[in-house]
């Protein structure tokens, strides 16, 4: 779950959602993860649209809105994006939860925002190849990793949420999604035409940020 994180000592506004990222006061101060569907998606959520919109004309409007964000973007990178926030290069960052965890470990005064427009979810799965030499061992590992105590330790360590609800009670409370966060979407596959437009939006956006 990507979230907004910012340094309240460096930001003059109270960030509540994605739409606030377009505020002129944030010029050249935002670090973004490098995921074209996610960044298109948060733009759509800021516009009241679905992250999985497939109407190409609507997606083109998303691209226009995204270009308006470019002046506020300091950098775009996927790995260790939190470092830009920690070293002062950026004052606001849009981070994966693992990066949020790393950032808070270094600076607990950072403010984490669960955007009011809703969250975008991605799911990482475990899969067993059809020709796996020891499927029983693989199933045993999956059973182990999903035990509440083990799943909670994984969440505390890396920051990714567990699909085992029973683990929530054992996780660091700061890493549990607040009860009042009720809106969200899973990023899903879209049509080839829609995906092509999302990628076009992304290419044009990155060029505008350079």
What are these regions (language model features)?
Residues 83, 185-210:
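Conserved C-terminal helix/tail region of periplasmic/extracytoplasmic solute-binding proteins
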Residues 92-110:
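A ligand-binding cleft/hinge motif common to bilobed small-molecule-binding domains
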Residues 1-89:
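Extracytoplasmic ligand-binding site segments that recognize negatively charged/polar headgroups
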Residues 119-120, 124, 129-186:
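Mature extracytoplasmic/periplasmic domains
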Residues 18, 81-84, 100, 138, ...:
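Short, hydrophobic alpha-helical packing/hinge segments within bilobed ligand-binding/sensory domains
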Residues 8, 34, 97-98, 157-158:
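Short secondary-structure boundary segments
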Residues 59-68, 106-130:
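Periplasmic-binding protein-like
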Residues 9, 23-27, 44-48, 67-74, ...:
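Sec-exported extracytoplasmic/periplasmic mature domains
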């Amino acid at each position: 779950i990507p979230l907004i994180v910012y340094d309240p000592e460096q930001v003059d506004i109270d960030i509540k959602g994605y739409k606030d990222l377009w505020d002129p006061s944030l010029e050249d101060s935002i670090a973004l993860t490098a995921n074209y569907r996610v960044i298109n998606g948060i733009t759509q959520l800021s516009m009241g649209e679905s992250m999985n919109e497939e109407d190409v004309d609507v997606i083109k409007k998303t691209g226009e809105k995204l270009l308006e964000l470019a002046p506020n973007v300091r950098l775009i990178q996927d790995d260790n994006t939190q470092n830009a926030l920690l070293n002062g290069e950026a004052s606001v960052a849009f981070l994966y939860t693992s990066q949020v965890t790393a950032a808070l470990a270094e600076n607990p005064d950072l403010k984490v925002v669960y955007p009011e427009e809703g969250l975008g979810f991605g799911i990482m799965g475990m899969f067993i190849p059809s020709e796996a030499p020891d499927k029983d061992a693989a199933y045993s590992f999956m059973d182990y990793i999903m035990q509440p105590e083990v799943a909670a330790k994984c969440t505390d360590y890396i920051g990714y949420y567990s699909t085992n609800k029973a683990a929530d009670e054992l996780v660091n409370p700061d890493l549990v999604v607040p009860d009042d966060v009720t809106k969200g979407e899973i990023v899903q596959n879209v049509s080839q035409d829609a995906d092509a437009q999302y990628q076009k939006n992304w290419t044009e956006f990155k060029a505008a940020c350079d």
